[in-house]
């Protein structure tokens, strides 16, 4: 009995340490910090690519004026071919780069919310945690075979599986987990709408190579794309997306802090926008809907013009 008592005491001390560590990390907002760093890295990457692309195109235009070999066509050189591809990317606002950024940003958002929940679970009252788990199938043997930290991850996984949150639209994916955990942040309607549409676009590139389906067009009424056509993410849409993500993550963290007795002021918009009201106009779709995908020969604006010119020339012969 003394041995059992020592084991139970050791486990009790271990639980206290885990709760204390979780509370410290939650107070410090470490998952939020990591997410903000991801957003800033994405902003930097998109900015560097755009600026470098425009500068490289400027250099290429100067080289066009002074060819290295007299009589050589600039378009036939390696630099000329590269600059032509670069020009298409710039004119079309780097569509595939923005699409990949969108998928990555949503994945980082999911990871941030999961990490916040994992820190929140040990801080909950046991009665609240029991209520949250009501209705889930708990395999006691599987649960007890795990270490303390793994048990929290297992609990979160069970909650996510039982609710099918990943199939929900917009931030419903996260609210389906947060609400049972007693976390209900106040979310501005503009932020909610932005994340609803951004997730719909993200799903297209995660599962359909960017091609619109009926579900997307229902979630984004008025979008110029038709079923089967490519949905082009604009730079403004990406900015609106990660801005709304930042505001949402800060709201979730603030709600957790309030429940723990350390309330925080409502999150303010990041410095690159004036107010949340700026988000919805930034979601305006690109009116141009290409015939092909960003990686196809027929994607560029100028390809349609070139085909028209060739058709006109052929008809005049």
Question: Residue ranges of each PLM-predicted region?
Answer:
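Polyanionic, low-complexity intrinsically disordered segments
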Residues: 1-26, 30, 34, 44, ...
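Short helix-loop boundary/capping segments at the starts of domains
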Residues: 41, 45-55, 114, 118
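Short amphipathic alpha-helix initiation/capping segments at coil-to-helix junctions
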Residues: 188-198, 231-234, 238
